[in-house]
Regions:
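Zymogen propeptides
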Residues: 25-232, 237-239
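Conserved, well-ordered active-site substructure
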Residues: 113-141, 279-346, 357-402, 406
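Beta-strand-rich structural segments
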Residues: 415-430, 465, 507-520, 559
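Low-complexity "stalk/linker" and mucin-like segments enriched in Ser/Thr/Pro/Ala/Gly
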Residues: 431, 441-453, 496-498, 524, ...
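Extracellular/luminal low-complexity segments enriched in Ser/Thr/Pro
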Residues: 449-463, 542-557, 612-614
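Edge beta-strands of extracellular beta-sandwich domains
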Residues: 472-482, 567-575
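Extracytoplasmic Gram-positive cell-surface binding/anchoring modules and repeats
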Residues: 551, 575-624
Length: 624
């Protein structure tokens, strides 16, 4: 639980959760689900996590569970080239240009922040776009997946005793030997060190592309020496090696090649990966054969961070997972992530790039475009090397056959007013026109006109909203918690939570309270809470309007807001309605008094009295 600002030791905000439950290591505080397709379910979940030290934190998760279906399949996608990064929405736009519509998506590979080049393999449309030795996730045409080490190896047979090991579409260093580039990388290599380059083209009519378990014959058609950024042919490949490489024999082998010479490029992979159509590299294996892994290599493994992971369950269904480390969500360590993926039923699970890279996107049924589902750690989504999407064929929408309510779930208190949006989709979940005869109703709610409902006073359990239109029906359920985790109190129209309150005697102050439940903002009205003040301070009504007692001296006490077993108490001081001895009857008296009690100015004290000198020249002492 966060500690609010304290202006002084005496001004302590007291927040009490009476009879608060003892939470396990991870306990689900609540969740809402939404079907994105026949076999794809989106779950927004809130967990209460207890660390090894006993600290309780909130965790907000976005989980997409997918079972194989004809209309939706997983794919890997990146920007126009491997070099550089791409925003999720721009990558989605590229998919749309290819005739696909995003159902949901998460970020994929770890990558070099300076170049955007992903670590590990990348496969799209059954074509190997980049090599690598990292663990990976691969998807087959039927929507199934494989996780593990793909053991992808690219070799070059140049007629020597031993074929050369090749790094495919990676940045050149003096340590990584022979490289092979295609225009998937970019139009140029953009390397920062000089190298020796050999231009090759496939023999016959073969395309300049590599596939798993493939052998490709190429012909030497040119050489380029002592160049950092060398052009990559559109219809071929570029072999390269650093001039200062530690692999001198490999450099000599490339330098020995002559025009017209025939070379063989061979790609091999582990059994079970031959038919993978999309893949991207990842990091540590989190769950293997149903058991949680504990030996991690990631440098931030023990840090609480935003995380992205993917897993395969015993029945073959897939789990796409993200958790936030922003706002009111603390993130997970890698060990906690492994335990969470196991708890979600994963037989095998793989860690993907996290932290500021963590991203979750979703197209809510009834909407024509996608939205960001998670809260990014950097305040906005980071451009990444690649993404994993669930996609369907894009097509014109038919007649509405499904109705949706948004928000599709959440938390509310009695008396709250909830604004809702009604959307419609056809049988393929494509956005469709909403029938015009929309009616709102439900359980523990009352239609409040237009697109609003009001939660009934005294409602318990859940408020269920129902929308009907054109013979279709949709529901959204809002849990009514018995207690809250925090109730910040603010001035009406202000955003800063109060840690104490000081007002003038006889003044009226409009206050508002907001309920929070494990980091989730709860729909509420001021009448959802019980307001009370110490008798000596004045009165407060059900809407949070505080009327202070008339007094010529400071009176102290407390103001308390309560919901269920949760209360928030502010220390309150009611002072004189005329704090300054020299402002009575002055034209600016009320303004000066208001600023004084707002803490904006303080005046000066003399002989036990407070003076403002309203007509004197302004000095710095007037302002705090």
């Amino acid at each position: 639980m966060k500690t609010w600002l304290k202006r002084a030791a005496a001004a302590v905000l007291s927040l009490s959760l009476l009879a608060a439950p003892v939470l396990a290591a991870a306990e689900t505080a609540g969740s809402s689900t939404l079907n994105l397709s026949d076999n794809t379910v989106y779950t927004y979940s809130t967990q209460s996590v207890t660390s090894d030290s006993g600290k309780q934190t909130n965790l907000h998760e976005n989980i997409f569970t997918y079972r194989k279906e004809a209309q939706v399949r997983p794919v890997v996608a990146f920007g126009s080239t491997l070099y550089g990064t791409s925003a999720m929405n721009k990558t989605v736009k590229t998919l749309e240009e290819q005739g696909y519509s995003m159902v949901a998506g998460i970020n994929g590979s770890f990558f070099d922040r300076s170049t955007g080049i992903p670590y590990g393999i990348v496969i799209t449309n059954s074509i190997l776009r980049s090599g690598g030795s990292a663990n990976a996730v691969g998807f087959l045409a039927d929507g199934s997946a494989v996780i593990g080490d793909p053991e992808v190896t690219v070799t070059l047979d140049y007629g020597g005793d031993t074929p050369l090991l090749v790094n495919y579409n990676k940045a050149m260093t003096t340590q990584n030997g022979v490289l092979l580039y295609s225009q998937d990388y970019d139009t140029r290599t953009k390397n920062t060190i000089e190298g020796y380059h050999v231009i090759v083209r496939p023999s016959g009519s073969r395309a300049a592309e590599l596939r798993l378990s493939q052998t490709l014959t190429v012909e030497v058609v040119g050489m380029v020496e002592d160049t950092k950024s060398c052009a990559i042919p559109e219809d071929g490949f570029l072999l390269a090696i650093a001039n200062d490489t530690i692999y001198k024999n490999a450099l000599a082998a490339l330098q020995s090649l002559v025009m017209g010479e025939q070379l063989t490029i061979q790609v091999t992979c582990a059994s079970g990966w031959e038919n993978v159509t999309s893949a991207c590299g990842g990091g540590d294996i989190l769950v293997e054969n149903g058991s949680v892994c504990t030996d991690f290599t990631l440098d931030s493994a023990k840090k609480m961070a935003a995380r992205t992971a993917i897993g395969v369950k015993n029945d073959g269904s897939l789990v796409f997972y993200t958790c936030d480390e922003a706002g009111n969500s603390e993130g997970l360590t890698l060990a906690q992530l492994a335990e969470r993926m196991q708890a979600l039923g994963c037989r095998t699970a793989l860690n993907l790039d996290g932290g500021g890279s963590t991203a979750a996107g979703v197209t809510y049924p009834g909407y024509a475009s996608g939205a960001t589902a998670n809260v990014p750690s950097d305040g906005k989504l980071r451009e990444c090397a690649n993404f994993i999407f669930l996609v369907r064929q894009k097509k014109d929408a038919g007649t509405a056959s499904k109705l949706y309510l948004y928000p599709f779930g959440g938390y509310t208190l009695p008396d709250a007013k909830i604004a809702l949006t009604v959307k419609a989709a056809d049988s393929s979940y494509m956005a469709a026109a909403v029938p015009t005869d929309v009616t709102l109703g439900g359980t523990n709610v009352t239609a409040a006109g237009g697109s609003y409902v009001t939660v009934d006073h005294g409602a318990k359990g859940a408020a269920t909203v129902t929308a009907t239109a054109g013979g279709l029906r949709a529901t959204a359920s809002f849990a009514i918690p018995e207690a809250l985790t925090s109730i910040p109190i603010k001035h009406e129209g202000k955003n800063t939570a109060l840690s104490s309150l000081r007002v003038a005697g006889g003044s009226t102050t409009e206050l508002t309270a907001t309920g929070w439940y494990y980091g989730n903002k709860v729909y509420s009205a001021d009448t959802s809470f019980t307001w009370s003040v110490s008798d000596a301070l004045g009165t407060i009504d059900a809407d949070g309007t505080f009327t202070a007692v008339q007094t010529g001296r400071d009176v102290t006490g407390t103001l308390t807001v309560t919901y269920g077993e949760t209360s928030c108490t502010l220390p309150v001081t009611v002072g004189s309605s005329q704090p300054f001895d020299d402002t009575k009857g002055h034209w600016a008296e009320s303004c000066i008094t208001e600023l004084y009690y707002a803490g904006t100015l303080q005046g000066s004290e003399k002989n036990g009295k407070l003076y403002y000198r309203p007509d004197a020249s302004m000095t710095r002492q007037e302002f705090i």
